Amino acid sequence: MAAALRPSNRVLLQALQTLVYPGVGGSGSVSCRCPVGAKRYLLTDNVVKLKEFQQKKVAIACNLSGTKEMYFRNLKEKLTQNKLILKGELITLLHLCESRDHVELAKNVIYRYHAENKNFTLGEYKFGPLFMRLCYELNLEESAVELVKDQHLRGFFSDSTSFNILMDMLFIKGKYKSALEVLIEMKNQNVKFTTDTYVLAFAICYKLNSPESFKICTILGEKALLKGEILSRRASCFAVALALNQNEVAKAMSIFSQIMNPESIACVNLNIIIHIQSNMLENLIKTLNNAAEGNLSKFVKRNVFSEEVLAKVREKVKDVPALVAKFDEIYGILHITGQVTTDSLDAVLCHTPKDRKSHMLLLNKRMFSRRTSQPLSQSLLAE
């Protein structure tokens, strides 16, 4: 299996370099033909943890003995005098930074700290996510990219969370090519891809919307399957959308068929686009009709369709009188039942789901009786 994976590793790396560095083994520059659309967060708050970071910043600043200026001055003196930088000092510094100048000092301290501790990284504190959250807060993604790609800091950003947060930053700002460079660096540093990484990678490729990005997306997906990894529904939806944008309908259908529970709003609308591009017009109208006339309880979630996607349906069936008449009837019903959204397909794809863990925390909080402070199960039995 390992031998079988090596060629695809080379192919993937070559494809990545071709897209990011057009002059290297490629066929010219790549332009982003896909509109930027909704610049939303792809990562949930549970991953970025910006609010928790900001709360901790306030707490550390309040408990600081002396002023911030004194703390910064002491660290500058340590750098000048080649004194040892302690872990706690760097943690505090990253929580005190409030400007680009402060971050420049933090970068110098990071270089010194890593040079002193790079041989003792096993079980060491992960500074990467902390620095990324700081850059996230201050809109300093360029500083984050600079440090991630610096060979002198190899091992400092050894976790997937650091790379994922940085790619999310770049994605939000429409810097898809830079985000792809970070993905390349992540792969070069052998940092493990997580579920979030695949979502970000496929979303970046979808936004770039080129034959090269489609190739990268395809290879990444195939390698994930070879490793026995299960791609999330969100990641698969971006892959399907990219395949459809590249008129690779068969590939889009293949990826879509592997999605478990294709009942999300993104899946529902992608399925309609697949029908349109496959010229399966009668099945298309039948699918819409079933969604509009289903005898569902008001408590059962109905399928919701993008106005943009429905416009594509009408354009497709406009030359078939029987179908266009039926579509207009269905279209009216869908509006009456509240099954049409003005969100574009791009906005639907880039929409960030709510944190599941936050809901679980709320549930866990109610596992104990407020009156007796006992587990609810015991409290109910006692009553």
Swiss-Prot record:
Alphabetically ordered keywords of this record: Mitochondrion, mRNA processing, Phosphoprotein
Gene Ontology terms for molecular function: RNA binding
Source species: Pongo abelii (Sumatran orangutan)
Subcellular compartments: Mitochondrion
Main location, first listed in the record: mitochondrion
Gene Ontology annotations for the cellular component aspect, listed alphabetically: mitochondrion
Repeat (PPR) residue spans along the chain: 161-195
Biological process (GO), any one: mRNA processing
UniProt protein name: Pentatricopeptide repeat-containing protein 2, mitochondrial
Pfam families: MRP-S27
Residues recorded as bearing Phosphoserine in the entry: 377
InterPro entries, alphabetized: mS27/PTCD2 (IPR034913), Pentatricopeptide_rpt (IPR002885), PTCD2 (IPR034629), TPR-like_helical_dom_sf (IPR011990)
Role summary: Involved in mitochondrial RNA maturation and mitochondrial respiratory chain function.
Family listed: Belongs to the PTCD2 family.
PANTHER family linked: PENTATRICOPEPTIDE REPEAT-CONTAINING PROTEIN 2, MITOCHONDRIAL (PTHR14700:SF0)
NCBIfam families from the UniProt entry: PPR
Coiled coil: none
